[in-house]
Amino acid sequence: MDDTSGTEGECSELERAGGWFMVEAIVDRRTGDTVSSDEDEEEDGGEDLVDFIDDRPVGDGQEVAQELLLQQAAADDDVEVQTVKRKFAPSPYFSPVCVHPSIENELSPRLDAIKLGRQTSKAKRRLFELPDSGYGQTQVDTESGPKQVQDICKTSQQDGCQGADEGRGRNVGGNGSQEEERAGGDGEESQTESVQTDTTACGVLAILKASNHKATLLGKFKEQFGLGFNELIRHFKSNKTVCSDWVVCVFGVYCTLAESFKTLIQPQCEYAHIQVLSCQWGMTVLTLVRFKRAKNRETVAKGFSTLLNVPENHMLIEPPKLRSAPAALYWFKTSLSNCSEVFGETPEWIVRQTVVGHALEEAQFSLSEMVQYAYDHDITDESTLAYEYALQADTDANAAAFLASNCQAKYVKDACTMCRHYKRGEQARMNMSEWIKFRGDKIQGDGDWKPIVQYLRYQDVEFIPFLCALKSFLQGIPKKSCIVFYGPADTGKSYFCMSLLKFLGGVVISYANSSSHFWLQPLAEAKIGLLDDATSQCWCYIDTYLRNALDGNQVCIDRKHRALLQLKCPPLLITTNINPLGDERWKYLRSRLQVFTFNNKFPLTTQGEPLYTLNDQNWKSFFQRLWARLNLTDPEDEEDNGNTSEPFRCVPGQNTRTV
């Protein structure tokens, strides 16, 4: 029975789509027949290419299936591309407060387009963009202005939901839009709880990954604590600058770590003031800490990152303001509240500015106390005095008042000037024996006098003649007050004289300044002088102008901006490579000079150190050993009875006030 279902009207059997066809094969050639090489070309009329032309009538319904197939293939390709992109994209960082990380929110193209910084207003086309749940766009305006934290979190949540919709499978048929809307609606209802739990992670990741994350942290600090972070700190530009006191604010900390931090930080610190507040990012920890050893910013950041498991870029680290009364009052008042954990002794800079007793102790600056400090520490250089006295501000009230004054440069200059006057007056009232004893008492430790004698013997210098010349030299006997050390280079002449000059506190004059009228001015303030490396021109100058100075008689010295000074020239040491006794030009200097020759090269050890050590301790031992031989004043009576003179004091006495 024929099956005519699905056909219209009567048709033959061959025209039916479901009928059977009879196919017969016609064999023109058999196996083994010879075939010409060009037979196919001659018989080919091109009729076999007719089947490649599609001459079907338009609208027969097959293009719908092809379009559907293309759409399905395109959808599958897009899903594969997104899968590859997600596979090779770096995993984002999640704050410890994030319970359920949302990968869809992090990898969503819409969330990635959100930036806190100002972007260009030019619209850009994104590659591989999938149409979302009925709101897909091919143009995305990347301009974003300043936004609040709450707006960014909301946008991140919405985009996370849309990203989740994009990751699901889609139907591209006629009902595709309805299925997408239904799938998107189901996703929102099912992910409402997870989006709410991920609000903290969205806020931290959206804000702390911004280009200007420090400004964001500063704004969040002011929102939480009610004041600016810069009002409590002073800025260190270098991360290598060390300080013992630091203010550290850490954002996004686990609640359990924030509580345990109060105990973990104690072994490292002498004082710690800890405040813990909660916010939508997690726990915020504000700490004022004084470490047992001074640390730089990098060391502090690494330590806090280890204790709190938070990246270093989630921290604000600066030293506190030490001379700000409002800042000190803030730390003092918050330490009394129940929101702070405090242990250790309160820093002195807080006590000084908050406790009434310490505030009353602040006094005006006294120049005499600064002069006394410079005199006691033998400081006559202005820069050294300013630095050393400023370091005493933490323990000395007068030094603190000095730092608070507006005339520091004037005070330093006046203090150094007065200290030099006192030192010069003290030196002028001493003879050479008292001066040597005074210089020796300042040197700590005992040395050995033998290296000095051994070095003189190494240079073939007779010790007894040298001792006699040194005795006359120290006593200032006329025509015996100048000792010359002559010899070739590298024999230790300058080393020997410089070590003796340092012990006696002498001065050095240089012939290079001889064109000035004031080049001899240092001799007016010293007990001994040194002219190093005298040349032939220098000897001619001495022979012409300084004969009476070598005699040890009274000379007149010109001083800058002062009147001429008449004084007895102090004993003078001279080193030279020219023998002044062998030249007839300087025959009048022969009776005024005591010459010792150093012919041997100065010996050194294998490490490059001097074989003979000539230091202050050895010279102290040398003078103590040969005190009587040098005919110096015998200090035995003073040692037995003690020093009757009182130490110099330029600070007026104070009466003790009873309470």
Curated annotation (Swiss-Prot):
Check the record and name the SUPFAM superfamilies matching this protein.
Origin of replication-binding domain, RBD-like, P-loop containing nucleoside triphosphate hydrolases
**Keywords, alphabetical:** ATP-binding, DNA replication, DNA-binding, Early protein, Helicase, Host nucleus, Hydrolase, Isomerase, Isopeptide bond, Nucleotide-binding, Phosphoprotein, Ubl conjugation
Positions bearing the Glycyl lysine isopeptide (Lys-Gly) (interchain with G-Cter in SUMO) cross-link: 568
- Describe how it is modified after translation: Phosphorylated. Sumoylated.
According to the UniProt record, list the residues that bear Phosphoserine.
91, 95, 108, 121
**Domain SF3 helicase stretches:** 461-611
Q: What is its EC number?
A: 5.6.2.4
Signal peptide limits: none
> What is the residue range of the motif Nuclear localization signal?
85-87
GO aspect biological process, one term: DNA replication
* Gene Ontology molecular-function annotations: ATP binding; ATP hydrolysis activity; DNA binding; DNA helicase activity
Acidic residues bias (residue ranges): 36-52
InterPro entries found in the cross-reference section: Helicase_SF3_DNA-vir, P-loop_NTPase, PPV_DNA_helicase_E1_C, PPV_DNA_helicase_E1_N, PPV_E1_DBD, PPV_E1_DBD_sf, Rep_E1_papillomaV, Znf_lg_T-Ag_D1_dom_sf
Q: Which Pfam families does the entry mention?
A: PPV_E1_C, PPV_E1_DBD, PPV_E1_N
As its record notes, the protein acts as a catalyst of: Couples ATP hydrolysis with the unwinding of duplex DNA by translocating in the 3'-5' direction; ATP + H2O = ADP + phosphate + H(+)
- Provide a GO CC annotation, any one: host cell nucleus
Task: Return the annotated region ranges for DNA-binding region.
Answer: 196-362
Transmembrane residues, as ranges?
none
Query: Where, by residue number, is the motif Nuclear export signal?
Result: 107-116
Q: Where does it localize?
A: Host nucleus
Chain positions recorded as ATP binding sites: 487-494
Bias type Polar residues, positions: 135-160
The entry sums up its family as follows: Belongs to the papillomaviridae E1 protein family.
Q: What does this protein do?
A: ATP-dependent DNA 3'-5' helicase required for initiation of viral DNA replication. It forms a complex with the viral E2 protein. The E1-E2 complex binds to the replication origin which contains binding sites for both proteins. During the initial step, a dimer of E1 interacts with a dimer of protein E2 leading to a complex that binds the viral origin of replication with high specificity. Then, a second dimer of E1 displaces the E2 dimer in an ATP-dependent manner to form the E1 tetramer.
Oligomeric and partner information: Can form hexamers. Interacts with E2 protein; this interaction increases E1 DNA binding specificity. Interacts with host DNA polymerase subunit POLA2. Interacts with host single stranded DNA-binding protein RPA1. Interacts with host TOP1; this interaction stimulates the enzymatic activity of TOP1.
From the Swiss-Prot or TrEMBL record, give the protein name. Answer: Replication protein E1
The scientific name of the source species is Human papillomavirus 3
